[in-house]
Amino acid sequence: MRKKRYLLGEIYKYCVNFDVQLIINNDYNLASLYEGSGVHIGKRDLPIKLIKSVIGTDRLIGFSCGGEIIDLNQLKENGISYYSIGAFAKSLTKTNAEELTQETIKKYCDNNDLPMCIIGGLDMSNIESAMKYRPNMIAICNGIFNQDKDRIKETIKKFQEIIDAKS
């Protein structure tokens, strides 16, 4: 745990330096330790009101919908800041995640009153397809880090160019 907190502290400093908000997955207690950081939760996590009582009401709280259709109005009423849907494609990070159907993605796009994040299996082969749905955010893991270390920076630049062109 000490190493985890040290590494997170270093990541937090990096985020502050580049004016990027740190979002911590599931661990709202950990998020409460870093000013301005947010937390991303799922259906099985504690009630949103309890999480807000720990981290504060001004923090971002994201919610994973997975592939289910969730009532976005209820999420908004409960104080969710954004939601994510996925997996967009086969994911190496969450191997048990089912791929979204186009119909499910379109339903979310049509009912989109909250910022939407597309997550899961995004890489150079499908990022343009994902961007056609005009998400507010995307989450990429293996599409960046599942390659030679010396190509990561170049890959991030390519993703950024595609995202900027489609935004």
Where are these regions (language model features)?
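A near-ubiquitous, low-amplitude feature marking generic local secondary-structure context
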Residues: 14, 34, 58, 88-91, ...
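Glycine/Thr-rich beta-alpha phosphate-binding loop at enzyme active sites
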Residues: 34-36, 41, 63-106, 110, ...
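Glycine-rich phosphate-binding active-site loops on the catalytic face of alpha/beta enzymes
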Residues: 43-50, 84-96, 129-162
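Short, charged N-terminal helix-start/capping segments
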Residues: 46-55, 76
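Generic signal for short, ordered secondary-structure residues
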Residues: 9-10, 30, 87-88, 109, ...
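Catalytic cores of alpha/beta
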Residues: 22-37, 67-81, 111-112, 116-118, ...
